[in-house]
Each structure stands twice: as C-alpha cells, then as structure tokens.
Amino acid sequence: MDSPGEPSFPSGLLSGGASPSGDEGFFPFVLERRDSFLGGGPGPEEPEDLALQLQQKEKDLLLAAELGKMLLERNEELRRQLETLNTQHLEHEERLQQENHELRRGLAARGAEWEARAVELEGDVEALRAQLGEQRSERQDSGRERARALGELSEQNLRLSQQLAQASRTEQELQRELDTLRERCQTQALAGAELGARLESLQAENQMLQDRRQDLEAQIRGLREEVDKGQNRLQTTHEELLLLRRERKEHKLELERARFEAGEALRTLRGLQRRVSELEEESRLQDTEISGASLQTELAHSLDSDQDQDQQVNECGGSQAILSPETQETSSPQPSIQEEILEPPKKRASLSPVEILEEKEAEVARLQDEITLHRTELQTLRDELQRQKELRAQDNPEEALSSALSDRDEAVNKAMKLSLELSRVSLERDSLSRELLRAIRQKVALTQELEAWQDDMQVVIGQQLRSQRQKELSEAAAAPRRAKTRFSLRLGSGQSGGFLSNLFRRT
C-alpha cells in the first residue's frame, strides 16, 4: 500500500499506457520512475542515502508537474482546433443550406411555371374536347371525320409530349446558362477590381502630370515676364536711341558752329600773319643799321615762324578734311536707320525677336561709337580754338608754337588712350550681347520643349481614353448578345403554343 503523503497518478499514465493519440509508450520514462512515484524505495537492507532519495523524488515530482502542464496545453490546443473546425463546419453547412434553399426556390419557380403551362394546356385540351363533343353531336354520321379528328388529336398529343421534352431540355440549358452567367459575374467582378486599380494608378499619374503641368506653366509665366521685361528694355533702348539721335543732331549743329569758328580763326590767323609780315618789313626798314648776322638770324627766325604757321594751317586744314569725311560717314548711316524705321511691318514681322534684338543692339552700339567720335571731335576743336585764342593772346609766337605742339602731342596721346578704352568697352559690350542672346535662345528652347511635352501628353491621354472607350463598347456589345440567346429560347416555346391553338381553331 502507498503511503498517504505520496502523490497519486493515474495508473495508465504511470504504467506507460496509451497516449491521447493512441500510440503505445507515449511517456516511456514514467515506467523507469514508477517505483520512485509509488514510493517503493530501497529496502532497509540496501544501504543508500536518504537525501539522495528525497532529491530523486523531487525531480520526479517536477517531471510529473511538467508532464501535466504539457497535457493541459495539448488539451487546450485540441479544444481550440475543435472549436475552429466546428465553426468552419457550421459556416459551410449554412452556406450549403442557403444554396440548397436558392436551388429549391428556383426549382419551385420553374415548377410553378410548368404547372401554369400544364394548366393552360389542360384548358386547351378541355376546349378541344368540347369542340370534339360538339363535332360528335353535330357530325355523328361522319366516321371519317372523327377518325381524322382522332388522328389530329394523337398528333397533337405527340407534339405536346415533344414540347414537354423540349421544355425539359430548355430547363437544363437555362441551368447551364445560369452557371455560365455566375462564372461571368465572378470574372467581371475580378475585372472590375483590376480596372479600379488601374483607374487609381491612372488618376495618380494624371495628378502627377497636372502638378508637372502647373510647374511648367509657372516656368512659362516666368519666361513671359522675362520676355516682357526684355521688350520693355527694348522699348527703353529705342527711346534712348531716339535721344541719341537728337543728341547727334545737336552735335552736328555744334560741329558746324565749331567749323565756322575754326574758319573765322583761320581767317584771323592769316590776317595776323600778314600783320606780322608787315611789322617785320617795317622793323627791317627801321633797323637797317643792324649787322648782317642779326639780319640772317631774324630771317631764319621769320622763316621758321612762317614754316610753323604754314604747318599749323595745314594741320588745321587736314583736321577739317579728316572731320569732313568722318562727318559724312556718320551722317551716311542716318538714312539707313531711317529706312529701317520706315521699313514695312511685314519685313520686320518676318524676323525673329532674337534677330530684331541683335539689330537694335548693333544700332545702339554704332550710335554710341558715333557719339563718342563726335564728342572727341568737338573736344579737339574746342582745344584747337582755345589754343588759337592763347596764340592770339600771347606776344611771343615761339612759346605759342611750342605750347601748341605740346598740346597736340597730349591730344594725340589722349586720342590713343580713348581709342584703346573704346575698343575695350566695345569688347565688353559684345560679350554682354552674346550672353543675352544665349539666354534668349535658352528661353526659346525651353518654350519649344514645353510645347512638345504638352503635345505628347495630349496624345497619351487621347490614346488611354480611346482604349477605355473601346473596352466599354466591346462589353456593351457582348451584353446584348447574351440577352438575345436567352430570349430566343423563350420566344420559340411561345410561338409553338400559338401554332397549336391556331390549328385547333381551324379544326
């Protein structure tokens, strides 16, 4: 007998009996520890330590607890699986019941239709029988007619049986059509889901394209604003050009005045030279007592002064001759500019904005060069007049001549410096004009790319709309065909019934 303090376990479990799944030896280690579970330790004759026995019992108890826990978890898992299987079974059973109910309802509807059809046929038969009775009462003597009527009735019965067989066949065909329609509905539902996903992708793509279009429109607006600014700049340059032309006219008038003053100065210079020659002759007559050496020196001095004066006069004449062709050259572009202004609008409209801008820039540059030349000419003439005035004011002609030569050298150096500065400025202006032309070409290229992109997007959207419309038309054309096949069977049965009724009425 076991002691009361020892744990009690099922006999099947401790004996290593059948497992929950039916397998033998599910827990083989229990048989090995059976004696320890049952408390059947060693006898008093076996010399073992009591502490080791207690430790062994504790280990066995822990193993038993773990085993019970595992069994409980296994039982819980099996219970959950059983519940899920029960729920699945119930759902499957409900679905089958619903389908059975729907099939029964369809069968009942078909039975009601066929019963109504049979009632109609029975009514026709009764009417035929009444007609047959009338014919029998009216034509009792005509046996051949009765035989013929009986033959017709037998034929009608045969036709009715054939119609019933045909009705059963049509019912089977309708059932098959119903199955095919269900399959088509499922396929259409799948196709609708695919179309919805595709529509969402197309909407996202359309939104992206609209955002890009808005960005490009903003760029176009910026480009248009820049073009407007360029046109405003062109208008301002045109106004500046008109102002420069007015200034050029004023400079021409000043040049004419300066030339007139230079002519007067030359005339006064010649008068002064004649006066000096007269004074020299008087001084020679008065100073006859002076030695030959002093006379020779005075003659040499007078000859040098005459040569210097002639050279100065020649330089003034050369400057006038140089100024006159330059003024002619500056005046010669005027008619060309006027001709360009008076040019017909058709020729100017045929040019591109870049070419017009280039022409305007060339005109402005040419006018600026002309203005600088006129200013330099005016400055030289003013300096020349100032020198002439100083020469007139001075008593010593040698100092005046030396100062005039030094001023001339300074003027030449200044002219060289100004020409170098003018060439540098013209180079800078050319580089700026090239940069401006490059920017305008980039703007034109961007506008062309934008127009090409808009055309491509319109083509893509049109193709997508056409493909979607063709799909809708094909689906709409397929639906009426199915309806035609369904209604043709029903109309065939109705027409046969009408033929029988007409035949009985004739008889």
UniProtKB/Swiss-Prot annotation:
The gene is Bicdl2. Residues 1-27, 324-349 are annotated as: Disordered. This is BICD family-like cargo adapter 2. One of its GO terms (molecular function) is small GTPase binding. Residues 1-22 have a biased composition (Low complexity). Interacts with RAB13. Keywords: Coiled coil. The keyword Transferase does not apply. Belongs to the BICDR family. InterPro entries: Spindly/BICDR_Dynein_Adapter. Residues 64-292, 354-459 form a coiled coil. Residues 324-337 have a biased composition (Polar residues).
